[in-house]
Amino acid sequence: MVQGTLEVLLVGAKGLENTDYLCNMDPYAVLKCRSQEQKSSVASGKGSDPEWNETFMFSVTHNATELIIKLMDSDSGTDDDFVGEATISLEAIYTEGSIPPTVYNVVKEEEYRGEIKVGLTFTPEDDRDRGLSEEDIGGWKQSS
């Protein structure tokens, strides 16, 4: 089983639907890979074209098949608004190693709501880095 670190570079978004009618929205992203979830900073007052340029690290195995990035609008005093989400397949990253910042569609209720730019890098974890010997992985260990 391939195991390692997925590095996600959240660059920015463009053309997002503004959920605040009186002023620019304050977008942030929630990144989820299987059970791990991380949150970006809030791009205060950046409206429909926020930039983050933030990096997030996830511990993954090859059975983590997708990264979901949910975009939200931070609202004080009321619940945050859901702007849309992008689902990114991770299958290519395990063979390619890295994917430069690429544009993905942001969707809400099956409709296009803008785009998000994300870069991905996968670094496999060497079994020796985890302190395991060949005998510890799927085999019998000779007792003395």
From Swiss-Prot:
Tell me where on the tree of life, at the top rank, the source sits. Answer: Eukaryota
Q: Which cofactor does it need?
A: Ca(2+)
List where in the cell it is found: Cytoplasm
Post-translational events: Phosphorylated at Ser-40 by CPK18 in a calcium-dependent manner.
Put simply, this protein is called Elicitor-responsive protein 3
User: Which residues are Ca(2+) 2-binding?
Assistant: D20, D73, D75, D81
Q: Residue positions of the PTM Phosphoserine?
A: S40
Which key words tag this protein in UniProt?
A: Calcium, Cytoplasm, Metal-binding, Phosphoprotein, Plant defense
**What GO cellular component is one of the record's annotations?**
cytoplasm
Q: Where does Ca(2+) 1 bind?
A: D20, D26, D73, D75
**One Pfam family linked to the record:** C2
**Which GO MF terms does the UniProt record name?**
metal ion binding
Q: Give the UniProt record's GO annotations in the biological process aspect.
A: defense response
Species of origin reads Oryza sativa subsp. japonica
What InterPro entries does the entry give?
A: C2_dom, C2_domain_sf
> Gene name, please?
ERG3
Q: List the disulfide bonds.
A: none
Spell out the residue ranges making up region: Disordered.
123-144
In the induction comment, the record states: By fungal elicitor and calcium.
Query: According to its UniProt record, in which tissues is this protein expressed?
Result: Expressed in phloem.
Record function comment? May play a role in plant defense signaling. Does not bind to phospholipids in a Ca(2+)-dependent manner in vitro.
Annotated C2 domain residues: 1-103
